[in-house]
Amino acid sequence: MSNYFNTLSLREKLGQLGKCRFMKREEFNDGCNFIKDWNIVIVGCGAQGLNQGLNMRDSGLNISYTLRDAAISEKRQSWQWATENGFTVGSYAELIPQADLVLNLTPDKQHTSAVTAVMPLMKQGATLAYSHGFNIVEEGMQIRSDITVVMVAPKCPGTEVREEYKRGFGVPTLIAVHPENDPQGNGLAIAKAYASATGGDRAGVLESSFIAEVKSDLMGEQTILCGMLQTAAVLGHKQLIAQGMDAAYARKLLQYGLETTTEGLKHGGITNMMDRLSNPAKILAFDMAEELKVILRPLFQKHMDDIIEGRFSATMMADWANDDVNLLTWRAETAETSFEKSPECDTEISEQEYYDKGIFVVAMIKAGVELAFDAMVDSGIINASAYYESLHETPLIANCIARNMLHEMNVVISDTAEYGNYLFTHAAVPLLADYTASLTLEQLGEGLKESSNNVDNARLIEVNEAIRSHGVEVIGKELRGYMTDMKKIASAK
């Protein structure tokens, strides 16, 4: 197999990268009826597999799970989750031949082996679905010509897919049809129905392409979503304790500070997050973010270039073939950081304190979101896709750190995301070491001591305008408006 993206002409590449359309609510009036009577078999029962399946069953669909023989005979975690939730579980040979729709929700690393195993068993004219297109785009998996291939990619971890559905809402979702595999011309109808069954249509659906999803997803998770959050936690903690702050308090300030400040990001973008700071702190955080962007821009651009040209995938797959030596080494190194090893702290910190003392955290988040967004858009990815893969998902990942530190984040994200995160962090931490060492305790985690809120009016206006006019803020305001409207519709029902 060879990288599918690299087989396309420049015109085809740009066309696929730039494919992105926010779908109208009326396009989902038929809900999931198109696949209502289908036999739907999910391959794998991890976080996405289980939670998507629960949502789809609650939407009235016929769902069962197929697992490897060893997973069934040894009653592994995937078997336990499926059976404990009352689903039919069977082997590939038992369930795949009767399936109208097969959802491949195994870990990225297992996609080739899973699809290779199930494809010969799939009946003529069946549909194969993914929630991430890495196997198609980067590994170049060739699917039988009679099989329709679609993608439905919720823009959050699997647990959140379920929780939002239970609240009567859903999570923004990207759908796509593989242009090489739509023999009956009904791929889009299938993808729409699948997305509706998971609750995605309640939050907003983007019609995109496999290529745009993969390239933007890889960039987001490597840089702002995981890499910058981990870098902020590791470097921030190291410098705070070096300047005399209690290790446990520093851990709490960062662990929950990342969650609190990105919660502000979720509701009103970078503008709202920055507005939670005092005027002097806002200007300081803005200036720090600009300095960080100068240092980090070449690294972000390198990651984007490596993703677009396939070098990242080749490097990661070489590590797969080498028994994950690099990934496991970086995972072990992360566990040994002072942030991860520090004890818990029971000192109360108010919501506003996290902002007041989080100037460094806010600057890192602002710089990371804007750099990731810009790198994607500069590569031909449409701004809506870039928004979802940068700003939108950041609070969801920060929630994982709040639950159980960096370990939780790296367990919940995909194997592909974990590798990319370590790759970025491994470069970013030494790159920022001198810069963070030059910061004062006020900048890092104590907050400004001056009581005056006085600033130069012209400078404040200039900073506010720069924050609000960035591309991620412009498209973000529009997309959050769509989601708010849709949430009202869902609540009314």
UniProtKB/Swiss-Prot annotation:
It catalyses: (2R)-2,3-dihydroxy-3-methylbutanoate + NADP(+) = (2S)-2-acetolactate + NADPH + H(+); (2R,3R)-2,3-dihydroxy-3-methylpentanoate + NADP(+) = (S)-2-ethyl-2-hydroxy-3-oxobutanoate + NADPH + H(+). Its EC number is 1.1.1.86. It holds the Pfam family KARI_C. It is an enzyme of class 1 (oxidoreductase). InterPro entries: 6-PGluconate_DH-like_C_sf (IPR008927), 6PGD_dom2 (IPR013328), KARI (IPR013023), KARI_C (IPR000506), KARI_N (IPR013116), NAD(P)-bd_dom_sf (IPR036291). One of its GO terms (molecular function) is ketol-acid reductoisomerase activity. Substrate binds at S414. Binds 2 magnesium ions per subunit. Pathway: Amino-acid biosynthesis; L-isoleucine biosynthesis; L-isoleucine from 2-oxobutanoate: step 2/4; Amino-acid biosynthesis; L-valine biosynthesis; L-valine from pyruvate: step 2/4. Mg(2+) 2 binds at D217, E389, E393. Signal peptide: none annotated. NADP(+) binds at C45, G46, A47, Q48, R68, R76, S78, D108, K109, Q110, G158. HAMAP family: IlvC. This is Ketol-acid reductoisomerase (NADP(+)). It comes from Colwellia psychrerythraea (strain 34H / ATCC BAA-681).
